[in-house]
């Protein structure tokens, strides 16, 4: 069989794709179906009723600055040569990032050989004529939000504003993608310290927009974007080459490690923004403070949650006899009852301690550690918590 030159080139290109492209399943899908992915999904729902200023939230730093988008063009140069992420914006969301950071610049974009208009682009440091449009980043967020599996998710979208005052353009681009999903600020204010994810979802919304740079003079942007995080704390790292060089002269900072994630949440940090978020370095798994490894497993119809000796959770038979986790709603402290009983007796046993006590479930790592200490002070190694899936298997709920 004779092949012409073009056929040979096409066959070579196809073979190259087959050789270079991974033949295994999507690693992000594998992660989502793993225990870590499922446990994080369950954990994100625990704190829906509590203020976001008390939540533990994984995010990514400079979400758009990913090696996935790295490219060079003969006429316009290279983009994202010093990346901080390995995956696309959408895949970072799929891995559990709920704080997304996009740096939007009003800068030149080469649209053809003779056209270099200014556009809103996503760029880090020195912008390139080849950088992606801001709308491309918004489109990835939009695609993730529209997935039926994500209708109960809430994200914070942080816009680092270098738009040179093009706030109407920026507003139009954001709202045309997911305007009906945005929880509006209503004016120049930080995110309220009492705002919960349940409140956002009850309004039919999913996106809380924070734009830095102060209050916008544009009425539309002013009414949509929050101007600060308020009492929500945030820590981040900078793994770029430029950032590393800066550390040499500034005395250096440690990278965020798995232990940093674990200890940071235990100390009460709200948002931890990772560079190079991936499924294999242990930092995502370190964000899990609730369910123990391979739990819940519904062994022998276990439908009620308890905390055991190491502070992690297990699903147990609801008729087992354990102490009860009671939270003081006045000062936020925890007590483990001296009395024991089946899970259903939790509310009554906590109320017996006083009207300020309720049968409760920890909603962040710091609270979970406080309950562990209270349990140990009582002399027990197991305690019931107010969390169960008795009505529908796998749908874990806090009983009101």
Predicted segments — roles?
Residues 2-11:
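Bacterial N-terminal signal peptides that target proteins for export
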Residues 10-20:
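Bacterial N-terminal signal peptides
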Residues 25-99, 106-156, 163-169, 173, ...:
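Long, acidic (Asp/Glu-rich), low-complexity accessory segments flanking structured domains
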Residues 100-102, 385:
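Active-site flanking residues adjacent to catalytic metal/cofactor-binding acidic residues
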Residues 102-105, 154-160, 185-186, 357-365:
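Surface-exposed patches in mature extracellular/periplasmic domains of secreted proteins
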Residues 176-190:
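Acidic, His- and aromatic-enriched active-site or binding-groove loops in soluble protein domains
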Residues 195-197:
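Extended amphipathic alpha-helical segments with heptad-repeat/coiled-coil character used for oligomerization
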Residues 204, 214-400:
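Extracellular, disulfide-bonded carbohydrate-recognition/adhesion ectodomains
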């Amino acid at each position: 069989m004779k092949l012409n030159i073009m056929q040979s080139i096409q066959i070579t290109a196809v073979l190259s794709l087959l050789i270079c492209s991974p033949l295994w399943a999507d690693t992000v899908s594998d992660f989502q179906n793993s225990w870590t992915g499922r446990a994080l999904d369950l954990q994100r729902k625990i704190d829906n009723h509590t203020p976001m200023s008390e939540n533990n939230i994984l995010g990514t730093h400079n979400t758009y600055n990913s090696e996935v988008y790295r490219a060079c063009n003969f006429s316009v140069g290279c983009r994202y040569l010093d990346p901080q992420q390995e995956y696309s914006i959408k895949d970072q969301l799929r891995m559990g990032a709920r704080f997304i950071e996009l740096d939007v610049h009003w800068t030149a974009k080469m649209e053809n050989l003779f056209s270099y208009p200014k556009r809103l682009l996503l760029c880090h440091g020195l912008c390139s004529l080849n950088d992606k449009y801001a709308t491309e980043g918004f489109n990835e967020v939009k695609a993730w939000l529209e997935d039926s599996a994500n209708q109960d998710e809430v994200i914070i979208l942080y816009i680092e504003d270098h738009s040179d005052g093009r706030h109407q353009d920026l507003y139009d681009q954001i709202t045309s993608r997911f305007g009906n999903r945005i929880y509006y600020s209503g004016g120049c204010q930080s995110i309220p310290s009492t705002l919960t994810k349940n409140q956002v979802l009850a309004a039919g919304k999913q996106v809380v927009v924070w734009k830095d740079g102060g209050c916008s003079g544009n009425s539309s942007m002013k009414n949509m974007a929050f101007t600060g995080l308020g009492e929500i704390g945030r820590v981040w790292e900078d793994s770029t080459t430029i950032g590393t060089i800066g550390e040499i002269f500034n005395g250096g900072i440690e990278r965020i490690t798995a232990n940093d994630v674990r200890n940071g949440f235990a100390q009460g940090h709200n948002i931890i923004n990772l560079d190079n978020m991936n499924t294999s370095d242990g930092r995502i798994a370190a964000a899990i403070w609730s369910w123990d490894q391979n739990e819940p497993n519904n062994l022998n119809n276990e439908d009620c949650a308890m905390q055991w000796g190491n502070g992690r959770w297990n699903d147990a038979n609801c008729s087992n006899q354990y102490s009860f986790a009671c939270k003081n709603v006045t000062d936020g402290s925890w007590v483990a009852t001296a009395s024991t009983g089946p899970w259903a007796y939790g509310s009554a046993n906590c109320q017996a301690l006083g009207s300020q006590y309720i049968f409760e479930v920890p909603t962040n790592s710091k609270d979970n550690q406080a309950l562990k200490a209270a349990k140990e002070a009582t002399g027990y190694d197991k305690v019931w918590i107010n969390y169960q899936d008795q009505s529908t298997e796998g749908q874990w709920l806090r009983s009101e």
